[in-house]
């Protein structure tokens, strides 16, 4: 029977997949997250998208009205700082809202737990979140899982990037720790099927795949499936020595997320899924098969609204490119109108060229010409750009009037990138955000990005400020 469901953390990796699955089954979904634009563009049936910041959830009680089930998929691993405190505060806010507006049940996707004296910050945060949610006087089903094998799973992408980017793998000793990796498809089935088995009291289930594998065995299986042969030599390196800088040059996964995950891999994390399989039987997918389907799924990454479903971007994508995009940008507040900002942004490549640091843009173009890469020059005469237009070596791939203009990177570099100009009306003011997104091709692509970061931050800051200044002059 269709339910009215609130998904908290709907824009995340699991959230996006879960919302699609629930939509296909005819449930009425309220998808809530801080950033829901990408999900909204999918225009899924029976799905309404709502911006919610659970650090200040003023609108959460209203969203809880008439809700049957809440999925809690929120975590703060990628936020940096004291994410334990952040996760506790989010859980407290949700608990308080549920006390005010109760629902029939809450399903919380958590992590497998190590013994208390062996827990990492990530595992402690997950446990604290569960304990707080259980104080809401609502039946809580906590579903604990270890490594999830699926496109976009941070743990999987760290492993993938290490195999693709390093000629020799020298992981710390935790590589011998064992776990029970589960395919994304199996995990989603459990999450959805729990709707048909509502809880009347708190309960905890553990989800597992069909195999117990050490991380070393997972690396070996991945190399066999992908055809990437690498030496794997574990070394006695404490995980606390793994720096953010090191992670920045071996994986496209956000380094704070990657480090938090790795800190939790020091001990065996084995699931006992006996109770869950008795309640919800299904065929569990073998690790190798899950890896094959995941690598196939990753080929579709660029065929998305972020890239305007552009055929050229899709053709340029390579399996070795990092799944997660590195990004750098700058946001400016302005009194200028959206119309004025949009008009200025559309002048890119014209009289104002790139608004700031034009000598640096020219230098970058000369570097391409020096290696024999010919770049187009010029832009259309019309005032407003259209999808498919060329702006020098860039290609316009997304045009959302008074909201977003996205250009496909056309210069020579190890990876695939785009440059986005995003506008937003905040009521008393507007914002202009200038931001580059980069999917690196192996370690050369990661080093290229790190070398360009200082210039990017300097240029994008200047571009955003100059666009705002020109728009304010036009508005006045």
Swiss-Prot record:
InterPro entries: ComplexI_NDUFA9_subunit (IPR051207), DUF2867 (IPR021295), NAD(P)-bd_dom (IPR016040), NAD(P)-bd_dom_sf (IPR036291). Keywords: Cell inner membrane, Cell membrane, Membrane, Transmembrane, Transmembrane helix. The keyword Cell inner membrane applies. Pfam families: DUF2867 (PF11066), NAD_binding_10 (PF13460). The keyword Cell inner membrane applies. It is a single-pass membrane protein. The chain crosses the membrane at residues 440-460. PANTHER family: NADH DEHYDROGENASE [UBIQUINONE] 1 ALPHA SUBCOMPLEX SUBUNIT 9, MITOCHONDRIAL, NADH-UBIQUINONE OXIDOREDUCTASE 39 KDA SUBUNIT-RELATED. This is Putative NAD(P)-binding protein YbjT. It comes from Escherichia coli (strain K12).
């Amino acid at each position: 029977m269709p339910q009215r469901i609130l998904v908290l953390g709907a824009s995340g990796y699991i959230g996006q997949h879960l919302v699609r699955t629930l939509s296909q089954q005819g449930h009425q979904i309220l998808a809530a997250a801080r950033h829901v634009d990408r999900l909204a563009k999918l225009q899924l049936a029976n799905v309404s998208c709502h911006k919610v910041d659970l650090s200040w959830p003023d609108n959460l009680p209203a969203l809880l009205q008439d809700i049957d089930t809440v999925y809690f998929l929120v975590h703060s691993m990628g936020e940096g700082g004291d994410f334990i405190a952040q996760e506790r505060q989010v859980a407290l806010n949700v608990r308080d809202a549920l006390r005010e507006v109760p629902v029939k049940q809450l399903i919380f996707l958590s992590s497998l737990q190590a013994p208390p004296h062996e827990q990492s910050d990530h595992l402690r945060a997950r446990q604290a979140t569960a304990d707080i949610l259980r104080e809401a006087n609502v039946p809580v089903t906590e579903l604990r899982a270890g490594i999830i094998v699926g496109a976009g799973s941070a743990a999987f992408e760290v492993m993938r990037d290490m195999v693709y980017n390093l000629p020799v793998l020298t992981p710390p000793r935790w590589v011998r720790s064992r776990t029970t990796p589960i395919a994304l498809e199996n995990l989603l089935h459990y999450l959805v099927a729990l709707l048909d088995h509502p809880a009347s009291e708190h309960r905890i289930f553990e989800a597992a795949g069909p195999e117990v594998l050490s991380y070393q065995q997972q690396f070996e299986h991945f190399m066999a499936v992908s055809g990437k042969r690498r030496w794997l030599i574990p070394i006695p390196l404490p995980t606390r020595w793994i720096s953010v800088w090191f992670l920045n040059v071996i994986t496209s996964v956000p380094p704070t997320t990657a480090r938090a995950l790795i800190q939790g891999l020091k001990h065996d994390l084995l699931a006992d899924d006996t109770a869950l399989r008795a309640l919800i039987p299904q065929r569990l997918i073998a690790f190798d098969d899950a890896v094959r389907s995941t690598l196939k799924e990753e080929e579709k990454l660029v065929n998305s609204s972020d890239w305007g479903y552009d055929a050229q971007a899709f053709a340029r994508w390579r399996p070795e490119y990092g799944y997660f995009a590195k990004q750098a940008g700058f946001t400016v507040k302005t009194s200028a109108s959206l119309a004025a900002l949009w008009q200025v942004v559309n002048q890119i490549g014209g009289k104002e060229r790139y608004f700031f640091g034009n000598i640096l843009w020219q230098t970058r173009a000369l570097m391409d010409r020096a290696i024999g890469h010919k770049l187009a020059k010029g832009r259309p005469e019309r005032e407003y750009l259209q999808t498919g237009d060329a702006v020098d070596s860039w290609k316009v791939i997304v045009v959302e009037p008074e909201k977003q203009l996205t250009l496909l990177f056309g210069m020579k570099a190890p990876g695939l990138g785009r440059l986005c100009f995003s506008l937003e009306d905040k009521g008393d003011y507007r914002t202009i955000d200038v931001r580059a997104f980069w999917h690196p091709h192996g370690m050369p692509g990661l080093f290229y990005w790190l070398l360009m970061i200082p210039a990017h931050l300097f240029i994008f800051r200047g571009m955003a400020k100059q666009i705002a200044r020109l728009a304010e002059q036009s508005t006045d």
